Amino acid sequence: MEAALFIFSLIDCCALIFLSVYFIITLSDLECDYINARSCCSKLNKWVVPELVGHTVVSVLMLVSLHWFIFILNLPVAAWNIYRFIMVPSGNLGVFDPTEIHNRGQLKSHMKEAMIKLGFHLLCFFIYLYSMILALIND
């Protein structure tokens, strides 16, 4: 059972890694003016909720299965994702708003956030991989 949990977490983490890379590529395309702000934000806003759900599901599964270290490791990023989603101003189209993305350095902050998430998900990938191997050996 524990091995299945870590296999699912590993697959989910791979999806979140690819999603972080997609965010970085799309934001860098906007930064270089290869795409306009409206198409960039519409592409990115489609993936905010799946990212939120994917990360929250893994965090809850770690809590339920009593893997405290991994849960506490995932908790700040999951809380940040939920906070960011809830605190979208009422006039904005989503977390990524085409009218606001070039103001006050938001593009750079979104890019920095995507890079940090990529590093975090890579760290989690190796933790899940190690835990999966350990669970398979112990079974």
UniProtKB/Swiss-Prot annotation:
Protein purpose: Involved in G protein-coupled receptors (GPCRs) trafficking from the endoplasmic reticulum to the cell surface; it promotes the exit of GPCRs from the early secretory pathway, likely through interaction with the COPII machinery.
Q: Where in the cell is it found?
A: Membrane; Endoplasmic reticulum; Endoplasmic reticulum-Golgi intermediate compartment
Record's keyword terms, sorted? Endoplasmic reticulum, ER-Golgi transport, Membrane, Protein transport, Transmembrane, Transmembrane helix, Transport
Record has Membrane as a keyword: yes
> What family is it from?
Belongs to the cornichon family.
Answer whether the UniProt record assigns the keyword GTP-binding to this protein.
Answer: no
Question: What is this entry's stated membrane topology?
Answer: Multi-pass membrane protein
Q: Name one GO cellular component term.
A: endoplasmic reticulum
- What organism is the protein native to? Xenopus tropicalis
* Coiled coil start-end: none
Give the record's GO biological process terms: endoplasmic reticulum to Golgi vesicle-mediated transport; protein transport
Q: What is this protein called?
A: Protein cornichon homolog 4
The primary site where this protein sits is: membrane
Point out the signal peptide segment: none
Give the residue spans that cross the bilayer. 5-25, 60-80, 118-138
